[in-house]
């Protein structure tokens, strides 16, 4: 089989230079402040509404279909404003 379908939370796929993680958050659940030094980050919201804070001075409210990308050296934290599912792709530099 050429394709693999995954729809559960957690690590979905990984390779030498990337990881794709599906995150599932309940309403009000927080993503603690952190960074991904040495990687680029791409977040794609599938369901719900996610508020992302970058470096404590930039706020983005993401809804299904929205994609945000940023360098992993930036500090990031977030809050699910409702039940939310999103894919996070980490790409090594």
What are these regions (language model features)?
Residues 1-21, 32:
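A short, N-terminal "cap"/entry segment at the start of jelly-roll beta-barrel domains
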Residues 31-36, 54, 79-80:
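Short histidine-centered beta-strand/loop micro-motifs
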Residues 46-47, 63, 82:
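A cytosolic small-molecule/anion-sensing beta-strand core signal
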Residues 72-93:
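Ligand-binding loop in jelly-roll beta-barrel domains
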Residues 16-18, 28-41:
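A short beta-loop-beta micro-motif enriched in histidine and acidic residues
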Residues 38-50, 55:
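Glycine- and acidic-residue-biased ligand/ion/polar-headgroup-sensing regions
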Residues 56-73:
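Short acidic-glycine-tyrosine-enriched beta hairpin
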């Amino acid at each position: 089989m050429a394709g693999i379908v995954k729809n559960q939370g957690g690590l979905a796929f990984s390779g030498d230079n990337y990881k794709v993680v599906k995150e599932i958050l309940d309403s009000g659940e927080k993503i603690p402040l952190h960074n991904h030094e040495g990687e680029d980050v791409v977040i794609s919201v599938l369901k719900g509404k996610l508020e992302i804070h970058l470096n404590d001075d930039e706020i983005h409210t993401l809804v299904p279909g929205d994609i945000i990308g940023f360098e992993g050296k930036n500090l990031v934290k977030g809050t699910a404003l409702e039940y939310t599912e999103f894919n996070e792709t980490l790409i090594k530099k």
